[in-house]
Amino acid sequence: MTTSVCRRAPAIFVNHGAGPLPVLMPVTDPDHGTARAFLEQVTPAWLGLNDVDTRPSAIVLVTAHWEESTVAISSGASHPLLYDYGGFPKEAYALTYNAKGSPAIAHKIHALLTAQNIPSKLDPTRGWDHGLFVPMKLINPAEDIPIVQLSVVRGSDPDLHFRIGEALAPLRDENIAILGSGMSYHSFHGRGNLVAQSKAFNDALVKACAHVDVQARGEALRAWEAMPGARECHPREEHLIPLHVIAGAAGHDALTSKDILSTMFEPVRLVSMGWGVQEL
């Protein structure tokens, strides 16, 4: 008789790229290829998708592209796609991603948040936005892992979002991975040396996230606005705040980070982070 051991699934923050372009452009594209390569090659390895013994049983994905007054949780057995972008080729509006939802996990998330006095609501109808389906088409094109999508909360309070992550952390012990989809740099009006600017901010982010002690990590991330170039890199922080959720869910795990040069708008450095990941 064998005993089944439930793996502790990882917590990962990824840069989802510019709209649908990581999916539409080839990996050799000079502007979008690096983002695509990370999502297509590194993230599946971090998640352990290539081995039945390390694959997560489900994924909870926090998207920068859904903001609500309280945490909203996709609770349907399936969800349509929400093409929440404009001005792209017609192929961008024919993309599909047919992974299942999980009402059971959605209700479990609602209960975990309620236990920590964090208001939340179930949403069985809203479509999955491109913060989910663009990276997931590259991360897991097999579409065979159930997903529950979570919103961020308007106002982007760093303390609240870190606490949301802490509340979700027990899911990892049930082999449910927690994925944050945003950008470590997100500004359309950058000035000056953006590579140096984004690298300085990313380095400060990594230093904050590298704290193994979860309390120290939380304190460092709550002060993100004091990091070098913070507001230049994030005039609005909705693309950063999923990282706070993931860092809160990371517990006392050690950090793995990977930085890439992206030229999707202007040349900038982007950093993705993972805790409890499968090493390459």
Label each residue range with its predicted role.
Residues 10-15, 58-63, 150, 171-184, ...:
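Beta-strand elements within well-structured catalytic alpha/beta cores of enzymes
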Residues 13, 84-89, 141-148, 222:
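Short, basic/glycine-rich phosphate-binding loops at helix/coil junctions
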Residues 37-45, 159-174:
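Long, well-ordered alpha-helical scaffolding segments within enzyme catalytic domains
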Residues 92-100, 151-158, 230:
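Flexible, glycine/proline-enriched loop segments at strand-loop-helix junctions
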